[in-house]
From Swiss-Prot:
The gene is Clcf1. It holds the Pfam family PRF. This is Cardiotrophin-like cytokine factor 1. GO terms for molecular function: ciliary neurotrophic factor receptor binding; cytokine activity; signaling receptor binding. It comes from Mus musculus. Keywords: Cytokine, Glycoprotein, Secreted, Signal. Residues 1-27 form the signal peptide.
Length: 225
């Protein structure tokens, strides 16, 4: 079939006329409220970054504590560290947590752990260790702010601390040097477990809040130009 230039322009004019008279279709809103997705993704990424950062900090700090704390197979019992928030939870219990409780537990845990880490920073004997701890505390404060942002986006209030309950990593005079090191060891170990759990928490939340993919695409092709 021979389509001449005039015929092509005529067909194009006809197509434009048809499109002009089609009922208006609202455009997809690409600039509106993105919802909680970006905040959740940012928080997830931050937990993974902190996991990486903690590996470096823990290696430095455990070497500072010395043997047996820097030995790979050392796994002492929890003694004075019972006040630390526990990340370990039964799998079925973890799955049954609603979004608000999941976020609240993360926020409260890191609020406590941050106070303990600041206590470690004050007690650190070397300038290099104090710098490493201060940098990690700043990153952990950023994670707290990110969790608060997710909660605000979802309409959840921040948990309010009870008066006079702010934790402090400051044992009494009867605490021996070895037991103090045990507490420090368990603080780092519990923090590692919390970051691992938080990555699972926010990955689960991210998948739950992910919007469905668009299923309709308008595709126009022009030929003959």
């Amino acid at each position: 079939m021979d389509l001449r230039a005039g015929d092509s322009w005529g067909m194009l004019a006809c197509l434009c006329t048809v499109l002009w008279h089609l009922p208006a279709v609202p455009a997809l809103n690409r600039t509106g409220d993105p919802g909680p997705g970006p905040s959740i993704q940012k928080t997830y990424d931050l937990t993974r970054y902190l996991e990486h950062q903690l590996r470096s900090l823990a290696g430095t700090y455990l070497n500072y504590l010395g043997p047996p704390f820097n030995e790979p197979d050392f796994n002492p019992p929890r003694l004075g560290a019972e006040t630390l928030p526990r990340a370990t939870v039964n799998l079925e219990v973890w799955r049954s947590l609603n979004d608000r409780l999941r976020l609240t537990q993360n926020y409260e845990a890191y609020s406590h752990l941050l106070c303990y880490l600041r206590g470690l920073n004050r007690q650190a004997a070397t300038a290099e260790l104090r710098r490493s701890l201060a940098h990690f505390c700043t990153s952990l404060q950023g994670l707290l702010g990110s969790i608060a942002g997710v909660m605000a986006t979802l309409g959840y209030p921040l948990p309010q601390p009870l008066p006079g309950t702010e934790p402090a990593w400051a044992p009494g005079p009867a605490h021996s040097d070895f037991l103090q090191k045990m507490d420090d060891f368990w603080l780092l170990k519990e923090l590692q477990t919390w970051l691992w759990r938080s990555a699972k928490d926010f990955n689960r939340l991210k998948k739950k809040m992910q919007p469905p993919a668009a299923s309709v695409t308008l595709h126009l092709e022009a030929h003959g130009f």
